[in-house]
């Protein structure tokens, strides 16, 4: 058996896996930058910057397509065990990142409509929720980059906190709408934006769970603690 040839085959495969992870992290960093920029334009009420964020979403979509092709090429080389889990994570994580980018673009898009109306005090609460979402995404990417089980577990646990903050903002906006019907239209935009941010947190948790799968295989995870109680809100 030509051990030198086998060594080069294995090293080439490992190098390609490492490049794949690097590309996925780069895609994630672009998505986080989009999210943080979207939160910024909501606060600054900057339509032109919001338009740029919406247009830049295409770059994330293109990266996902490119990464998907790379993953398929690696899969054809017959990965085993841990490498197969790397391949599966390489398919799943970019899909979550792509959705994060979509939700960030949606926040920016709705900010343009919101800018035609007087500013609302709840914008500050929306930003706080968005910062939690952005931190969740950053930490999930860090757990993937470093293969860190502890960070991934923490992201999963913190999703309940994000849900609770979303529910609090949901209540706040409903109350504000009931106090004055003129608040209904802008509050509805903020409700949709808040839901986008809550879903970003869910996708960050998906990434963290894929890291745990990558590290531990098919080990059963406990059910996520969910604190999104918006369906049970009673304002009577």
From Swiss-Prot:
GO molecular function: protein homodimerization activity
GO BP: intracellular phosphate ion homeostasis; negative regulation of phosphate metabolic process; negative regulation of phosphate transmembrane transport; phosphate ion transport
Keyword Transport: yes
Subcellular location: Cytoplasm
Keywords from the named record: Cytoplasm, Phosphate transport, Transport
Annotated function: Plays a role in the regulation of phosphate uptake.
Name of the protein in question: Phosphate-specific transport system accessory protein PhoU homolog
Name of the gene: phoU
């Amino acid at each position: 058996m030509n051990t030198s040839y086998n060594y080069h085959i294995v090293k080439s495969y490992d190098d390609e896996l490492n490049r794949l992870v690097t590309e996925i992290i780069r895609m994630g960093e672009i998505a986080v930058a989009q999210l943080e920029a979207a939160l910024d334009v909501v606060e600054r009420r900057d339509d032109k910057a919001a338009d740029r964020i919406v247009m830049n979403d295409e770059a994330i979509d293109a990266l996902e397509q490119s990464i998907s092709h790379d993953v398929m090429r690696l899969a054809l080389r017959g990965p085993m065990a841990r490498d197969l889990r790397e391949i599966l994570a390489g398919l799943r994580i970019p899909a979550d990142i792509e959705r994060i980018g979509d939700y960030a673009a949606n926040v920016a898009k709705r900010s343009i409509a919101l800018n035609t109306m007087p500013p609302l005090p709840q914008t500050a609460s929306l930003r706080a929720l968005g910062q939690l979402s952005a931190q969740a995404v950053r930490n999930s990417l860090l757990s993937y980059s470093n293969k860190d089980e502890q960070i991934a577990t923490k992201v999963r646990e913190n999703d309940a906190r994000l849900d609770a903050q979303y529910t609090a903002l949901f209540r706040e906006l409903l109350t504000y709408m009931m106090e004055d019907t003129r608040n209904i239209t802008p509050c509805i935009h903020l409700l949709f934006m808040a839901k986008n941010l809550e879903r970003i947190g869910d996708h960050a948790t998906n990434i963290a769970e894929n890291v745990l799968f990558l590290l531990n295989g098919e080990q059963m995870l406990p059910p996520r603690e969910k604190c999104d109680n918006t369906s049970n809100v009673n304002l009577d």
